[in-house]
Design a protein with these regions (language model features):
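NAD(P)+-binding Rossmann beta1-loop-alpha1 motif at the extreme N-terminus of oxidoreductases
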Residues: 1-46, 50-57, 96, 115, ...
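Short, well-ordered alpha-helix to beta-strand connector turns
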Residues: 22, 55, 78, 100, ...
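Rossmann-fold NAD(P) dinucleotide-binding segment
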Residues: 47-97
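Small-residue helix-packing motif on alpha-helices
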Residues: 33, 51, 67, 188-195, ...
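Internal alpha-helical scaffold of NAD(P)-dependent oxidoreductase catalytic cores
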Residues: 39, 92-101, 117-159, 171-209, ...
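NAD(P)-dependent Rossmann-like dehydrogenase/reductase catalytic/cofactor-binding core
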Residues: 130, 197-256
């Protein structure tokens, strides 16, 4: 499958690196497209329409506000389209690309290392018993290469964005805070970074193997009245749960 990228920003680069194969691409900043094509062994093309004509699957990585303008250039020649645009539901995408297969995915930056989660939006208009077409299967398998694929109702994809697409920045901040705390108490920053990130990666794998039972893992680490219990109590007093809830509200633009 020839993959064509419309836009060569951070997420487009992460996906291309995760796929590890040549891509066709276009970006208004020509240097970005050229750099990505050179890195991946692909080709930077001269227009959105040229990408559409040469790709088997066009992946929309542009700004959401550009949907109508870019669809006017891409739709006449595109064979299939996958969108990673935020706050752009399937109905709106299908309206812009009415005569071809259209898919909506939500990746996150760890796609670069084939890690993290990838959300696929389920089509609310599709009959439950309808079978996947060959292109449906090929596109789903392509994005599943980038991480753990989770299918959600289209209406929930933007909520998922606050949980996983934004989460690498949140996790990086948590790591930074832990490293800073250790550094202030004498551990060199390089060693503190290794300690925290290795523990984070190991805990994520442990949770996967324990069927995501966070309570069970916490109980194994936490002895009554012990140091971990005191640390957890301090985090709760500091409003850790409320902070993450507020962050999700901020992402969704909600007011409470």
């Amino acid at each position: 499958m020839n993959i064509g990228l419309i836009g060569c920003g951070n997420m487009a680069r992460a996906m291309a690196r995760g796929w590890g194969r040549p891509v066709l691409c276009f970006d208004p900043v020509a240097e970005r497209a050229q750099a990505l094509a050179q890195e991946m062994g692909g080709k930077a093309l001269g227009s959105n329409a040229e990408v559409a004509a040469r790709a088997d699957l066009v992946v929309l990585c542009h700004k959401p506000a550009q949907l109508g303008r870019i669809a006017a250039e891409v739709a006449p020649a595109a064979k299939a389209v996958a969108s990673i645009l935020a706050a752009t539901p399937l109905a709106k995408l299908k309206s812009a690309y009415p005569d071809i297969p259209v898919y909506r995915f939500l990746p996150s930056l760890p796609a670069e290392v084939r890690g993290g989660a990838i959300v696929q939006a389920s089509d609310p208009r599709r009959e439950p018993e309808s079978a996947d077409t060959p292109i449906d299967t090929e596109v789903r398998e392509l994005f599943a290469e980038l991480g753990t694929l989770v299918v959600l109702d289209d209406s929930l994809v933007d909520v998922a964005m606050g949980l996983m697409s934004c989460a690498p920045a949140y996790v990086a901040l948590v790591v930074e805070a832990q490293v800073d705390a250790g550094t202030r108490r004498g551990i060199p920053p390089a060693q503190a970074s290794v300690l925290v990130t290795a523990t984070l990666a190991g805990t994520a794998e442990l949770l996967r193997r324990r069927d995501y039972d966070t309570l069970a893992v916490r109980r194994e680490v936490t002895s009554p009245g012990g140091v971990t219990a005191r640390g957890l109590a301090a985090l709760e007093r500091g409003g850790l749960r409320a902070a993450f809830d507020d962050a999700l509200d901020a992402v969704l633009g909600e007011q409470r």
